Amino acid sequence: MGPVWLWLLIAELLLPVHYQPSSAHGDKSLGAPQPASHQSLEPAPAYHKVTPTITNFALRLYKQLAEEIPGNILFSPVSLSSTVALLSLGAHADTQAQILQSLGFNLTETPAADIHRGFQSLLHTLDLPSPKLELKLGHSLFLDRQLKPQQRFLDSAKELYGALAFSANFTEAAATGQQINDLVRKQTYGQVVGCLPEFDRDTLMVLLNYIFFKAKWKHPFDRYQTRKQESFFVDQRLQLRIPMMRQKEMHRFLYDQEASCTVLQIEYSGTALLLLVLPDPGKMQQVEAALQPETLRRWGQRFLPSLLDLHLPRFSVSATYNLEEILPLVGLSSLFDVEADLSGIMGQLNKTVSRVSHKAVVDMNEKGTEAAAASGLLSQPPSLNMTSAPHAHFNRPFLLLLWEVTTQSLLFLGKVVNPAAG
């Protein structure tokens, strides 16, 4: 018999951005974690104990991926970190501490129980219904039908992470794989398909996480302004001709001389915003090295609103990773260590994680704007000189950070090197 496998499977989806009439609500948070305010006597929500750590972990993981992968990068920090934290519920003694510390938590300052309650609060808040933002997260456990999982683990996983458990027959690998892929396809409305790679007949458990995001721009792009063929410079040798959305609109942005990049904040309706980082030509590595929580906070304090001539690619990008080789490089080696104690999941049958599969999809466009052709949402003040507006032309590789504002949580982090790669 071959090795017994435990799998973590994470699937993410950021769906097309549609038209939404502009609302009258005020400016949102700037999209980077800000110091907590102590003016209110009400206790801070429990998710405040985990969201800064999720961001720190995401930046560490991104830098490691950037060293290994020359092309597009996309992953969901909330999805991946919550899945790893859920798994730690089944770890005992040193293994649990090592997993949580590897995510970046200081267990002296934030005990394990507070961490799990923080994730519970975060997932619950993100899952609250919103008329302007569709955000759906979920965890599912597929356990071999011959196993007798620990009831305490199943109860805690359901209570804290909303994880549902299903019995599976892994000896029928093809049928079970189809069952899991069908669930992902259903929960992501058919947008993420075939996310589960082939697994061994000796697999015992698949831990699945998915996140589905769909939102509308606060200031939509007019599809009639989109140029079907505009240059995008992947590098000094490769130039593409791609659809480029165009807009002159009020946005918050800045130029960071120290990092050599332009940073733009684009708001969605509802409680989400997108941070786009455009390095100067040849400065991508310099910008990536500067990606620190302090940098995000500094940007958040320096944004200024201005009329902007914006050119942004219309693109769809997907990324699939097997992270079992990457996660140990950011400290999560204990998940894969043969000495790891995960007996809290299945009692005496203690096995390590063999595979962490992660798939993310982002699709950004101006779809739906034709429904608002008469709404006049290019609402620049008439006194502004449109010809003198500063410009941000995303015609070369750039970074994207998608935030949920209420929780200050980083939903997606990525790099678009080739917007035509699909």
UniProtKB/Swiss-Prot annotation:
Glycosylation sites (chain numbering): N106, N169, N350, N385
Molecular function GO labels: serine-type endopeptidase inhibitor activity
Entry keyword set: Glycoprotein, Protease inhibitor, Secreted, Serine protease inhibitor, Signal
GO cellular component, one term: extracellular space
Chain intervals for the UniProt region annotation (Disordered): 25-45
Domain of life: Eukaryota
A Pfam family it matches: Serpin
Signal peptide: 1-24
Localization terms from the record: Secreted
InterPro entries: Serpin_dom, Serpin_fam, Serpin_sf, Serpin_sf_1, Serpin_sf_2
Database matches in PANTHER family: SERINE PROTEASE INHIBITOR, SERPIN, SERPIN A11
Family, similarity comment: Belongs to the serpin family.
Identification of the protein by name: Serpin A11
Record organism: Rattus norvegicus (Rat)
Gene responsible for this protein: Serpina11
